[in-house]
């Protein structure tokens, strides 16, 4: 790929990608680009690691495309960018996929298969998917350090997590304790609250009576989890709430005394099917506090500590609202709020449910049953004990495991925690030092999450993860200060009773499980848990730098300059990094955050592979190419909003790249014919030899295009710096399509067609070379394939080997001409209006017109035409332009009036018809209602005619053969009138240009070289038209490269209908 080599006629994305991939490999393009900035100012980008649990979907494709684009942009801005890709290779996302492959349904299957064998399967699965993911990312042009990714399974990375956790422990923020946690009974492990995914399900909805001990009646509670009632310890009320004692009567005359929140009485009685009731007494919630009751299933679950002090009484609960019954069944062994309030009250924690969701022996009658399966038995037992007031069902949102989709349960277990709540103020202060795009994501969504974040449960009862590096002594008391937390492999080797090689030790289970440590005669063994997988990625900002094993890069680069992920990471990676950075290092590990949205289907539905609702990236690449797909993804705002994929917009991107391709191809053959010595500036690795814009005698339109380019460069750079690359793309594409393709190329086409080299052609060549080079650079982060190919043709052997080594284009103030830009904006608006007027008149642009009249509404129109009227005349193919100054009237215009009889009738009564007829005949030279009234009065012989603007609508009447159209810009307005009256001179040139167009088509059909000369015979079957054509023989021969018009012996012959006249044209190559 060099110089003026062959350029395919059409933009073919697949062909371009194939050639560019080969080229990149041949010249080590990525490696050269990295080395080129090796000594520059650093920019530390940290890649949020995707799970290696499947192929790249549209969401990860959008994410990686954004990252790649911003990395390329920063490199072009002169930075040495850290671009190490990362992969999250531990945790449930991997384990559940492996379980599916092996047909496992529970932990028991894993135990039977063998823990070590299962871990090896997980490792193999993660490695295989890493290769697939990496291949996916490379397929759409992502450049990262693919040979050196950070992997959460590597010993150096796992050590980074161990070290951070040991720092957290040294800071006094590690605790072993009981908490109510979300538990997946299938995976048999705790999961973080932010990992819980909610689905609508149908569950029991029961109202239960808890009989009071020392007074008549029952407390009425409501729950959707009957399976938690065996663990009930207290009932919570709102101490400030209003409650009522109600005597309710059933249809058969029996009565029940119930205690319910005042606002809930009617609903509770309706649910219970009561026919009548009376309010016995009003109570405040504080009145009820201290009342004791008998749990309805006490005999079925004898292990429930009914005799413990304070159990089975009424207490205040901050979370209680006047909803359902206004009294809340509370089981500290299950619910999070229940557990916290129970701890405050020093109540026992009774949890008769195991990690698998099955009742333990403490569950009494229900022992061995899965909790949700036990609901029916519990409901039946409540009914048998006359404790059931009403049993219904409800559809509601319920939490499920994020990986296996099993409904979660809340149970209390012993876990390891980082006590984030102890450093909440530091978390919020550190958060405020980071800059977010959009800002509201930090100040609203993220702040809310951080403010309400509980202590971080970092332990998981699984296999494939980073083992928790805690060794506990024999007969451990549970005090976190008495444990050993190992921070590095070297430390492990020094402390271990066994021989451990720090360079080769595998830190995974079960290797580390067998390692013991003895200190002062006491043996320590490792706890069996692995880390929450979010802790893995929380250390990415130093793990990617191989810290603490290597310190230099950390000291130079940390914290990260930029991270970017989707908005779900406010509860995920953004949060875990802030939490770990603050707890371990006292600082936030990133300075700037770009938060984008989700990738959705075209109709706005969320994509889901499991539901078959998805658009795969390879589908899009096969249909339209990688560059168009990237450009669409980068045309969407990256700041918080979700993206709905659009096939149409992706097709439009391919169309725009095809326009760029054609613009690029346009001057190449002319440049080659003239041996144009193209200039390559130093910013592109060139030596500034050849003909540049500084050496050329630029014409007005060249200066205009270069000025517009400066405007676009300034806007694009500002948008990139504001993380609005979509707006930068809009600006560049508008320039390519509107300014470059639809205007400049059309204006300079005839300059390119001139036979001999000239200063005018040279200026156009130099302008196109510079503009195309900089446009290619501006588009390089978006479309790395096509820009690479175009760049190589533009630079040949003079520039860098890859466009991605080039500097980002900077604004050249000397080329700015804002006044010229404003003038040309007026001319283009007038040209568009003139084209519309031509269409109205049915006159093609290739036919000249005798004159164009511009009725200017502002002086800026007059100024633009005075300075550059010849440019508009050329574009509208007119022999002359006449200008009507602002405030003046074109004396060839007239205005008639269209009457509104609904206004004339009431005003003129019986004379309205006569007035209307007079209005139809009246003509004035301006939209002057008084002048119109004078004409009507004179026509009717009256002097009492008064008209208003509501009575008539002025209608402009142009002279015969004249059509007009208005235009308006931000600073100018006017009307363009085109006089399409024919005379022989106009006809002669019009027919001649019709001949030229058809000969050019024939040349193309014959595949003639652009500079090939021909013989041309023109036979016209109309004597008059033939004479008109003959008058412009020099124009025809010049435009078609015909030596002469004359008889052709053996040429390509075609018959044409030209404006109703038959012509036979015959072309023969010389």
UniProtKB/Swiss-Prot annotation:
Q: Does the keyword Glycosyltransferase apply?
A: no
Keyword field contains Transmembrane: no
- Which CDD domains has this protein been placed in? Anticodon_Ia_Ile_ABEc, IleRS_core
Which domain of life does the UniProt lineage start with?
Archaea
Q: What is its main location?
A: cytoplasm
Q: Name one GO biological process term.
A: isoleucyl-tRNA aminoacylation
Catalytic activity reported:
tRNA(Ile) + L-isoleucine + ATP = L-isoleucyl-tRNA(Ile) + AMP + diphosphate
GO MF term set: aminoacyl-tRNA deacylase activity; ATP binding; isoleucine-tRNA ligase activity; tRNA binding; zinc ion binding
> Required cofactors, per record?
Zn(2+)
Instruction: Write down a Pfam family by its short name.
Output: Anticodon_1
Locate the motif 'HIGH' region.
50-60
Q: What EC number(s) has UniProt assigned to this enzyme?
A: 6.1.1.5
- Summarize the subunit comment: Monomer.
Its biological purpose: Catalyzes the attachment of isoleucine to tRNA(Ile). As IleRS can inadvertently accommodate and process structurally similar amino acids such as valine, to avoid such errors it has two additional distinct tRNA(Ile)-dependent editing activities. One activity is designated as 'pretransfer' editing and involves the hydrolysis of activated Val-AMP. The other activity is designated 'posttransfer' editing and involves deacylation of mischarged Val-tRNA(Ile).
Of which family is this protein a member? Answer: Belongs to the class-I aminoacyl-tRNA synthetase family. IleS type 2 subfamily.
Q: Give the comment on domains.
A: IleRS has two distinct active sites: one for aminoacylation and one for editing. The misactivated valine is translocated from the active site to the editing site, which sterically excludes the correctly activated isoleucine. The single editing site contains two valyl binding pockets, one specific for each substrate (Val-AMP or Val-tRNA(Ile)).
Alphabetical list of HAMAP family matching this protein: Ile_tRNA_synth_type2
Q: What is this protein called?
A: Isoleucine--tRNA ligase
Q: What is the source species?
A: Halobacterium salinarum (strain ATCC 700922 / JCM 11081 / NRC-1) (Halobacterium halobium)
Q: What is the lineage of its organism?
A: Archaea, Methanobacteriati, Methanobacteriota, Stenosarchaea group, Halobacteria
Underlying gene = ileS
